[in-house]
A protein has these predicted regions:
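C-terminal motif of bacterial Sec signal peptides marking the signal peptidase cleavage site
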Residues: 30-33
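Surface-exposed short loop/turn segments
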Residues: 35-36, 238-289
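Beta-strand-rich structural segments
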Residues: 77-106, 136-138
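Short amphipathic beta-strand segments in non-cytosolic proteins
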Residues: 85, 107-125
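Glycine-centered loop-to-beta-strand initiation motif
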Residues: 128-138
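Short beta-strand elements
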Residues: 160-193
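N-terminal segment of the mature soluble domain
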Residues: 186-258
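Short secondary-structure boundary motifs at beta->alpha junctions and helix caps
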Residues: 285-329
Length: 330
């Protein structure tokens, strides 16, 4: 409130201090802005320093593992699913001089299950013993597979695994050991309904080539399905399963193998002989319950000096591949 002299009298007037408030607000905002900018700059600098320090630690780890190697010592023979390996998977960690490295942390990746035909894996953190070795024997499994276990230098949790140089360095030091677990078709056996077709697409015979290859791979209890009429080709699998189940039941044989072997490309004359392509479509069915346990397809191209030689070579290569899929996939 101010008193202003006007026409010889003091008049009381109320004065609003907008300008003062505005100037105060501007000063306050300016101060706040300066503080924020200072803090932001400080935070960015801090992040940059931390980032540099983090990569420095990763580079140090990369340098450390550059001087080591993980080598395979022993891989046990394949087993049938449901059984344990008779010996351990064994490896050793060595330094640049070839000496064993004790208490070295290693990550082990190994198969633990199969879902819809796809292998799933788990990991373990292990340390080398005093002699630099690692021994591992997985529990018996309920699935078959032909895959690998992997051993890599264990990355400390404090490091950033998204750093590309780190993952590349670890990958370069990874050891893969083959792990093979056979299907129980080896001891349970199977009946075969796999018809070979000629170049005109007509079924000719239940595949003796495949039957022989299964026997050669240890499947002693194997024979043609008691119900093998070609009229079942292309029909629902349940009809073929039911017809054979009525004859042999669900325990005499472990599996019913159903499928076809057809010419994808007929025998063709080429400069140095003949060539053809065959394709096999195979389904494995559990005789106990009729469930499909394997679906696989293999295509093969081969050559030969004449028609018979070409087809024979192609059938041989094809059945070798398809039987391997059955042994390690059923």
């Amino acid at each position: 409130i101010k008193y202003i002299l006007k026409k010889g009298k003091y008049i009381k007037m109320r004065v609003k201090s907008k300008i003062v408030l505005l100037l105060f607000s501007i000063a306050l905002i300016s101060f706040s802005s300066c503080a924020t900018t200072k803090n932001a700059t400080s935070t960015q600098t801090e992040k940059k320093i931390n980032k540099t320090q983090k990569y420095d630690l990763e580079e140090q780890f990369i340098s450390e593992i550059s001087n080591i190697s993980i080598e395979s010592l022993e891989i046990p023979k394949p087993v049938i699913k449901g059984r344990k390996f008779k010996s351990d998977f064994k490896s050793i960690v060595k330094n640049a001089e070839g000496n064993p490295v004790a208490n070295f942390p290693v990550q082990l990746k190994f198969p633990i299950s199969k879902v819809d035909g796809k292998i799933e894996y788990s990991t373990l953190l292990l340390h080398t013993s005093e002699d630099g070795t690692i021994s591992f024997n997985p529990e018996s499994t309920s699935f078959s597979c032909d895959t690998f276990i992997e051993l890599t230098p264990a990355i400390p949790e404090t490091l950033n695994i998204e750093y590309e140089k780190l993952t590349e360095a670890v990958a370069a030091k990874t050891l893969k050991q083959s792990i093979k677990i056979k299907s129980d078709i080896i001891n349970k056996g199977a009946v075969l309904f796999v018809w070979e077709h000629n170049e005109k697409g007509r079924p000719t015979s239940n595949s003796y080539t495949m039957l022989s290859e299964l026997r050669r791979n240890g499947v002693a209890l194997i024979g043609n399905a008691p119900v093998s009429d070609t009229s079942f080709i292309g029909k629902p699998l349940k009809e073929l399963y039911d017809a054979n189940y009525e004859v042999i039941g669900g325990t005499m044989y472990g599996y019913l193998l159903y499928g076809t072997i057809k010419f994808e490309v007929p025998v063709t004359k080429v400069d140095d002989g003949y060539t053809c392509t065959l394709v096999a479509e195979i389904v494995g069915i559990d005789m106990k319950n009729g469930e499909t346990t394997l679906t696989t397809s293999v295509s093969c191209t081969a050559t030969g000096s004449n028609w018979n030689n070409c087809v024979s070579n192609c059938k041989s290569e094809l059945t070798t591949s398809i039987v391997n899929n059955i042994i390690y996939g059923l």
